[in-house]
Amino acid sequence: FQHIVVFPGGNWIPKLWSDKNYNIVMKSLLKKYNNIKFILVGSAKEKENYYRNLVNGIDEKLIIDLFGCNLTLTSAFMKKSDLFLGNDSGLMHLAVSNQLRVISLFGPTDDKIYGPYGESNVVIRTKENLDYFKSIHIDANKSYMNSIKTNTVIDVIEKLLK
């Protein structure tokens, strides 16, 4: 099996991509590849917020639930995984430190400053650039990540899985 670590959470709502989008990506990959398992990571609170939508329609045997686990265990699983998909977050940096290939989603934050370092890592940005985000009042209760399309993320993952 190839293991893809998925982190839908983060500490700021404006930079969170929808859990339903992650679910679409996961289900699409499972239609094309029969050797993928998903390792879901985050806090216990994030599990409450995202788990149901994340795993909707996915066989539980293909899910490894690490929500609420400590960083040591999460890090150990990352070391044995093939890919990380997630928002701009501390767990994204933990994945980088474990030499995991990272696909990180960015919107209102600067990927040149906060993005994953390393040649093999990929940043997918919203179509809105940083100047746009600097020019508006950011509502802390609203996601600004909706211009990232699931097909874009799927295409990037498929290139990295080859």
Model-derived features: where do they sit?
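Glycine/threonine-rich flexible loop motifs
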Residues: P14-S18
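Conserved donor-binding/catalytic core segment of Leloir-type glycosyltransferases
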Residues: F1-I13
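Donor-binding and catalytic core of enzymes assembling or modifying cell-surface/extracellular glycoconjugates
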Residues: D19-G107
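Short, Lys/Arg-enriched, disordered terminal segments
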Residues: F1, K31, N35, D59, ...
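Gly/Pro- and small hydrophobic-enriched strand-loop and loop-to-helix capping segments
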Residues: N98-T126
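Flexible, glycine-rich phosphate/dinucleotide-binding loops
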Residues: I13, K47, D111, L130
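Short clusters of hydrophobic/aromatic residues that line enzyme substrate/ligand-binding pockets
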Residues: L66, Y114, M145-I148
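Leloir-type glycosyltransferase catalytic cores
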Residues: E119-K162
